[in-house]
Structure formats: structure tokens, C-alpha cells
């Protein structure tokens, strides 16, 4: 089993619901360690750059607008198979399809306001972590 790191973002909808602590508890119960964290309000250029992979998709403008509407909580998670484990905890992108007990089933309102983001693979995780954190900010 490999120790991995992954990026997690608690999106503006979940921050506004005051469920950061409940989400952190789920990470920890799954054996994921929070090794870096910060709260910030993404600027439009930051959100556009972070989600640039989706720039040709029809939902891109709404995604950028949503991600800049309020503060987000960004963290690096570390643990055995952290990427897959985090994605399992998050649940399906569409909360209506998410399994009961997942973050999205419990806290998300819609496919757009879906509470959390998580890296989808090892290379993406490295890029996303570097986007938000300098090496000396990760413990």
C-alpha cells in the first residue's frame, strides 16, 4: 500500500453551512492526516487557472463563479491510498447519486454546489497541491 497525498477543497457551499469540522472528522476517521490547510477566498483568475482543464466545458463559467462566491477551505491529505480513499469519502459528483454517509450525500445541494473537490489521480494531486501550497507549508 502506498502513502499518497491528495488535495481537498471544501467548497463555498459547505463552508457557508459551517460543516468544515464534520468533514475533517470524516477524513480523520478514514485514516487521512491533514498535513496542510488554509482558508481563502479564490479570485476569479485563481479559479480560472485552477479549473483551466474544464475551460471548454459548458459548465466552466458557472464553476468559476461558484468557486469565487465565498471562502473555501483547502487542505492536503496524506495516508494509504489517499486519493481513492478521499474520493470514496466524497461520494459521486452528483449528490443524488452519492452513497449515504458520503460528504456529498450529507452536505451537497446539487451537482454544481457539491461541497467538496478532490484530486482525481497522482499527477493531478501533485499539480493541485503545488498550485495552493509551497513545500514549506506542508507538514
Curated annotation (Swiss-Prot):
Keywords: ATP-binding, Cytoplasm, Kinase, Magnesium, Metal-binding, Nucleotide metabolism, Nucleotide-binding, Phosphoprotein, Transferase
UniProt-annotated location(s): Cytoplasm
Name recorded for this polypeptide: Nucleoside diphosphate kinase
Family annotation (Pfam families): NDK (PF00334)
Cofactor list: Mg(2+)
Subunit structure, as described in the record: Homotetramer.
Annotated active site: 117 (pros-phosphohistidine intermediate)
Keyword Cell inner membrane listed: no
Principal subcellular localisation of the protein: cytoplasm
Family designation: Belongs to the NDK family.
SUPFAM superfamilies cross-referenced by the UniProt entry: Nucleoside diphosphate kinase, NDK
